[in-house]
Amino acid sequence: MAGKTLYDKLWDMHEVKRRDDGSSLIYIDRQILHEVTSPQVRGAAPGRANVARGCQHRHPGPQRADHPGSPVGGRRHRRRNLAHPGADPGRELRRVRHRRVQDERPAPGHRPCGRPGAGRHLPGMTVVCGDSHTSTHWCGALAHGIGTSEVEHVLATQCLVAKKMKNMQVRVEGELPLGVSAKDIVLAVIGRIGTAGGTGHALEFAGSAIRGLSMEGRMTLCNMAIEAGARVGMVAVDEKTIDYVKGRPYAPQGADWDKAVAQWRELVSDADAGFDTVVELKAEEIRPQVTWGTSPEMVLPVDERVPDPASESDPVKRDSIVRALKYMGLAANQPIGEIKVDRVFIGSCTNSRIEDLRAAAEVAKGARSPRASSRRWWCRAPGWSRSRRRRRGWTGSSSRPVSSGATGCSMCLAMNPDRLESGEHCASTSNRNFEGRQGAGGRTHLVSPAMAAAAAVAGRFVDVRQLLQA
């Protein structure tokens, strides 16, 4: 009998019933509610009937309002600047509690950072939320986004109707060079397979380079598996995973811990497991990445040049390059190192963990030269609360000017006051660089935290390896 992949094992563990149409009923361990896709189940949205159906279980039903508020200025400032004046998404989320959802003590940070760090989501679980980047929740778990109608279905039944996806493995072997991070790995993968390469697949990252990453780095990979077209991103459980969970507030204790660990160690793909698609990269060949266009797949190493549409034989791709260059205000064959940066954003569910802030601070440390112009605005939107950052020894960066504050989505997307002005170029550690993503006419370049900090220091994109070796 052929071996099973990690995805196969997680699916089989939670499959309640296989239906005649090929879909299955899957049991859901955790559902997260947030202010964009969840209040509608109470009829909070205009034109939607109020639903009186109750909940299947009083299991922990965490609720977060991440998207609409600016992290800068504190709670009162955030409430004044909600995306819809007069609306309080948090209030609408609290209304969902009337359906007998038991809420939890707030996690110390926004959803994709605070919850794994608190041990609320554990290996072997199924986790869903009305947010595509739910895949961040996290290694050894089956986590993905769902739609608003599915949010209601899970609340009512504790199950989800789904069709099993194909299996895809991205294997990265070797040791990462200095200055190259998980963000560079996943951008290089997307540059290789495109934003549709993982469509219909559950994507598992594997290989010695992946095992060498921290848990925070693995979360970055799982987060951006979505930009590769996959619905799920996963990394197998290993001793690093178990050490990360141990001692967390909501992790099992005593005999329950020993039993859980024995089960978690089985959450790896078997040696003879078959994958529908396998992509292989050599870690030593990956360089710091920068997106130059309006899609995550429009990405190149920092020491290369923007592509020339004249060299593209495919007319569809050629037209796409032309449009992207026009929107981004770039010229064909322009060195990426000549692209000037107006803003720097270090945050989002992709790169806002302590490790990311430290990587940026290490690059920016002592950088007080005239190049650090006051025109370049840093916005740090940390994924963990201020108290938790202090407990982990984070003291912040001395670089100025820097805006920093509460946790939240901030400038990742233009649905709160943190946004770009038209024509501004932003070195961003977020996950999407579509037209207008960070503000109408704003030009987003996706990079790692270290590369973002290097751009802030130099005022343009530079190879962070040069700064680290200096």
UniProtKB/Swiss-Prot annotation:
Q: Which residues bind [4Fe-4S] cluster?
A: C349, C409, C412
Q: Which reaction does it catalyse?
A: (2R,3S)-3-isopropylmalate = (2S)-2-isopropylmalate
Protein name per its UniProtKB record? 3-isopropylmalate dehydratase large subunit
Alphabetized UniProt keyword annotations: 4Fe-4S, Amino-acid biosynthesis, Branched-chain amino acid biosynthesis, Iron, Iron-sulfur, Leucine biosynthesis, Lyase, Metal-binding
Instruction: Give the family this protein belongs to, as stated in its UniProt record.
Output: Belongs to the aconitase/IPM isomerase family. LeuC type 1 subfamily.
Ranges for the region named Disordered are: 50-121
Record carries keyword Nucleus: no
The answer, when asked if Chloroplast is one of the entry's keywords, is no
The EC code for this enzyme is 4.2.1.33
Assembly mode: Heterodimer of LeuC and LeuD.
Q: What does this protein do?
A: Catalyzes the isomerization between 2-isopropylmalate and 3-isopropylmalate, via the formation of 2-isopropylmaleate.
From which domain of life does this come? Answer: Bacteria
The protein's required cofactor(s) are namely: [4Fe-4S] cluster
Organism encoding this protein: Azotobacter vinelandii
Which pathway does UniProt place it in?
Amino-acid biosynthesis; L-leucine biosynthesis; L-leucine from 3-methyl-2-oxobutanoate: step 2/4
Q: Which GO terms describe its molecular function?
A: 3-isopropylmalate dehydratase activity; 4 iron, 4 sulfur cluster binding; metal ion binding
Q: Which GO terms describe its biological process?
A: L-leucine biosynthetic process
Q: How is the cofactor bound?
A: Binds 1 [4Fe-4S] cluster per subunit.
